[in-house]
Amino acid sequence: VDLLPELITPRSRILALGQMSNVTGGCPDLARAITFAHSAGMVVMVDGAQGAVHFPADVQQLDIDFYAFSGHKLYGPTGIGVLYGKSELLEAMSPWLGGGKMIHEVSFDGFTTQSAPWKLEAGTPNVAGVIGLSAALEWLADYDINQAESWSRSLATLAEDALAKRPGFRSFRCQDSSLLAFDFAGVHHSDMVTLLAEYGIALRAGQH
């Protein structure tokens, strides 16, 4: 975020950034980034796929233009996701596909579309996916996400402190993230994951 004033040029039109890194757990300062971008006349797109389940962004308070996340990251089905967009921006967008309920009126000269968001939803919707994601969101609503995130961070800290006592340990954890990425000098990550799996410890290895 500190580099944005140097990177933004008069040709810059859109700033796309992730809410949270799924490698280090790092989170950019969205408020600062959005302020920089908007002052330059840019539109901001935030990828919330990794962050939505940890700390949902307040799109109105942060003045986010577009915010997207996938359903399976919230314990919902695959093949479904959510795109939030400011109404004036959605209305200004042209449909990328035609057909189905997105059409308002048809004539020999062409067709007119429904208003947003329906004009952007051509064809048969993913009904099963929508129902599944809705059920997942209802289930999540019964839990305190902030409390769960705090608990996850404490577990990550506990693991990091314990592993730091071992020689060759190197942590890539960002700040106080609930995600802990690490390696050990001289030990291949695939070997480490395979060995730990025999003790009932499930980890993910390799580049991502």
Where are these regions (language model features)?
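Pyridoxal 5′-phosphate
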Residues: 1-208
